[in-house]
Amino acid sequence: MSRRGTAEKKKAKSDPIYRNRLVNMLVNRILKHGKKSLAYQIMYRAVKTIQQNTEKNPLSVLRQAIRGVTPDLTVKARRVSGSTHQVPIEIRSTQGKALAVRWLLAASRKRPGRDMAFKLSSELVDAAKGRGDAIRKKEETHRMAEANRAFAHFR
């Protein structure tokens, strides 16, 4: 057994303008090459675009999008007697949110166009309405877990 204590879980910090943890999670995932100010710029422009286009509270749209994309189940490869099975496992809410943020950003990067803020805002609005690539990814993951339900006892 390890003599060290377990590492304490760090709480996600909130961003300076909206005081929101989800915004900060998104900013930290947008971040490339240490350019955090650019990541904040992209995020705040996306939020502004959401505000103008939907005329709703952009933070509620963001929350709704992340809630819609957050998966409940995922599959994990488990090797059993020489063959690898995709075993469905339940995931915690923090891990689910992290996956949702990752999928939203991947889907928005895939969208056509040059402006990342516009692509991100349109992906968030689509996800809040229940469509878009990120939602498709969640449904695909759930389908995989459902298809491999027979291997759930390998957990």
Swiss-Prot record:
Task: Note the Pfam families from the entry.
Answer: Ribosomal_S7
GO cellular component: a single term: small ribosomal subunit
InterPro entries assigned to the protein according to its UniProt record, in alphabetical order: Ribosomal_uS7, Ribosomal_uS7_bac/org-type, Ribosomal_uS7_CS, Ribosomal_uS7_dom, Ribosomal_uS7_dom_sf
Q: Does the keyword RNA-binding apply?
A: yes
The protein's GO terms of the molecular function aspect are: rRNA binding; structural constituent of ribosome
Q: Which GO terms describe its biological process?
A: translation
Task: Give UniProt keywords alphabetically.
Answer: Plastid, Ribonucleoprotein, Ribosomal protein, RNA-binding, rRNA-binding
- Primary residence: plastid
Subcellular location(s) of the protein: Plastid
Record flagged with keyword Ribonucleoprotein: yes
> What is the role of the protein in this entry?
One of the primary rRNA binding proteins, it binds directly to 16S rRNA where it nucleates assembly of the head domain of the 30S subunit.
Against PANTHER family, the record matches this protein to: RIBOSOMAL PROTEIN S7 (PTHR11205)
Q: Kindly state the subunit structure of this protein.
A: Part of the 30S ribosomal subunit.
UniProt lists the family membership as follows: Belongs to the universal ribosomal protein uS7 family.
What is the name attached to this protein's record? Small ribosomal subunit protein uS7cz/uS7cy
Tell me the classification of the organism that encodes this protein.
Eukaryota, Viridiplantae, Streptophyta, Embryophyta, Tracheophyta
| Gene transcribed to yield this protein | rps7-A
